[in-house]
């Protein structure tokens, strides 16, 4: 089983880096897991320019996704899932014969529409908005508990 997390931006805060390392170290003992970071574009401030930023980041994300992968995008407008539902979704993806499950975390502006269309499922951890850097840590924690 291979797990890939495609995330826009880099982690700057040490406390988040430490948490990510904690869960990655645990998961890597059992699973082939990697994080692929996509360059984050600066927010230009205008709606038209923001859409261009989403497109640029989205094209980079799509380039990294294999055709044979099961893709789960984390999007604020996605289906809100519980820990149990998340675990069931991940296990189901591997049970369907997919060799890789790809999770996508967008940047501060979200995820481009075409990436959400490519995803097999769009989920949300909460109706609240979290910094995308913190979402990476939350995702790893949920993956860890889903695959125990």
Curated annotation (Swiss-Prot):
Q: Which CDD domains match?
A: RlmH-like
Q: Which GO terms describe its molecular function?
A: rRNA (pseudouridine-N3-)-methyltransferase activity
Q: Where is the signal peptide?
A: none
| EC number(s) from the headed UniProt entry | 2.1.1.177
Q: Which family does it belong to?
A: Belongs to the RNA methyltransferase RlmH family.
UniProt superkingdom = Bacteria
What InterPro entries does this protein map onto? Alpha/beta_knot_MTases (IPR029028), RlmH-like (IPR003742), tRNA_m1G_MTases_N (IPR029026)
What's the protein called, per UniProt? Ribosomal RNA large subunit methyltransferase H 2
Q: How does it assemble?
A: Homodimer.
User: Which reaction is the catalytic activity of this chain?
Assistant: pseudouridine(1915) in 23S rRNA + S-adenosyl-L-methionine = N(3)-methylpseudouridine(1915) in 23S rRNA + S-adenosyl-L-homocysteine + H(+)
Protein task: Specifically methylates the pseudouridine at position 1915 (m3Psi1915) in 23S rRNA.
Which key words tag this protein in UniProt? Cytoplasm, Methyltransferase, rRNA processing, S-adenosyl-L-methionine, Transferase
Q: Which SUPFAM superfamilies match?
A: alpha/beta knot
Which annotated residues bind S-adenosyl-L-methionine? 74, 106, 125-130
What Pfam families does the record point to?
SPOUT_MTase
Coarsely, its chief localization is: cytoplasm
A single GO cellular-component term from the record reads:
cytoplasm
Name its cellular compartments: Cytoplasm
Q: Which organism encodes this protein? A: Caldanaerobacter subterraneus subsp. tengcongensis (strain DSM 15242 / JCM 11007 / NBRC 100824 / MB4)
């Amino acid at each position: 089983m291979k797990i890939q997390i495609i995330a826009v931006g880099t982690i700057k805060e040490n406390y988040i880096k430490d948490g990510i390392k904690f869960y990655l170290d645990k998961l890597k003992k059992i699973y082939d897991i990697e994080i692929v970071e996509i360059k984050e574009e600066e927010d230009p401030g205008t709606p038209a320019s923001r859409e261009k930023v989403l497109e640029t980041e989205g094209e980079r994300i799509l380039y990294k996704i294999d055709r044979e992968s099961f893709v789960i995008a984390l999007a604020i407008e996605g289906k809100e899932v519980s820990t149990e539902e998340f675990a069931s979704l991940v296990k189901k993806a591997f049970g369907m014969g997919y060799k890789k499950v790809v999770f996508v975390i967008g940047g501060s502006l979200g995820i481009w529409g075409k990436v959400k269309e490519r995803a097999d499922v769009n989920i949300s951890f909460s109706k609240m908005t979290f910094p995308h850097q913190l979402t990476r840590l939350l995702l790893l924690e949920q993956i860890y508990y889903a695959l125990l």
